[in-house]
Amino acid sequence: MWNLKGWIKQQESNMLELIETLVNIDSGSYIKQGIDKVGNVLSGEYAKIDFETEVHEQQKLGNNLLIRHREAVNPEILLIAHMDTVFGEGTVAGRPFSREGDYAYGPGVIDMKASHATTLYALKALMESGSEAFKNVELVLNTDEEIGSIASRELIEQVAKTKKCALILEPAQNGHLVSERKGGGKYFLKVHGKSAHAGISAIEELARKILKLHALTDWEKGINVNVGLISGGTSVNTIAPFAEAAIDVRIETWEDGDTVDSAIKEICSYSEIPGTRLELTGNITRPAWNLTAEAEALIAIITEEGQKNGLELLHEKSGGGSDANLTSFAGIPSIDGLGPVGADAHQESEYLYIPSLAERTLLLANVIERLSSK
């Protein structure tokens, strides 16, 4: 008798081979050629099982991909996995994919090259089992998640609005699901003054604004406004004609996002020092993702499917944002952390726990089957 769990376990070496191929491609968010190469590898793999790829081309960033089976009609489940990493050109040459016992290493191995393997093989497993559930999914493989999904946000939200739920394949820290995430945004403030020995200081104007911006931080509410980068001036003995700052914002709720956004724009709408001029750009790029009753019901289904195969799944709130922030904002229940288990994302020590590949592939396949049978 054919066994789903057994078949998936037998595919572990194939999954690792795909992961090695993907890891050994430099695909930092701004490396378009590398990301598109990753996209070509994945679209080729999906084509082998009759999934069609719709390419959303971009000039500077990698092309986003929308993938579904050629016989799919109004699929209800959205799967999202990003193809970019935080690592620059040449990283792979210095530390390519490697394996040591139950662990695999390499740039982006857990965040999130391994998730592409578990996703592909979950769909293959459903096909092998005779299920039709693989026709009920649509995948967005985006290319800029690590820099805020600014270019892919419109596509994600557009597709999400046609779905009943979203499953985000970010890696699972300690095996936990993610049910909530902070929102965030980035702003850039430029200040123009006048250069002279007795001119109008752009740096002084910026300094006054920084104090007001930092005063927006409210730790009890989970609001953090931080000016993390500043620059300005031309020499130590002249008044600075120009200064600029980069501002990072983290918020707990949608409402706080609106409040902080308005406050930042108000602070930067006028000059403290006569003769200076301010330019502000940016916004809340990721709305906060808060747990809803619909998402709790989705968690219940996922945890039940995990328990059937010995996985005790907990869910937690995470500080960093992901594409689940966008799908939740679009109005559909969303759960994150469905990828394989690993840790140290964005670090040289990043790793994948190899035994989790089969476990998370089986979990994803069973969840898709369960959601498709309702």
Give the predicted meaning of each segment.
Residues 1-13, 49-51, 83, 184, ...:
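Secretory-pathway/membrane protein signature
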Residues 1-105, 128, 324:
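Acidic/His- and Gly-rich active-site-bordering loop/insert found
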Residues 7, 230, 311-371:
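Zn-dependent metallopeptidase/amidohydrolase metal-coordination segment
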Residues 7, 11, 18-25, 41-49, ...:
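Generic non-transmembrane alpha-helical segments
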Residues 74-138, 147, 353-354, 358-359:
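Active-site metal-coordination/substrate-binding segment of hydrolases
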Residues 83-85, 103, 140-147, 169-173, ...:
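Acidic, glycine-rich active-site loops and adjacent beta-strand->loop/helix elements
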Residues 145, 150-294, 300-304:
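Midchain, well-structured core segments that form catalytic/ion-binding scaffolds
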Residues 210-218, 290-335:
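Active-site-adjacent substrate-binding region
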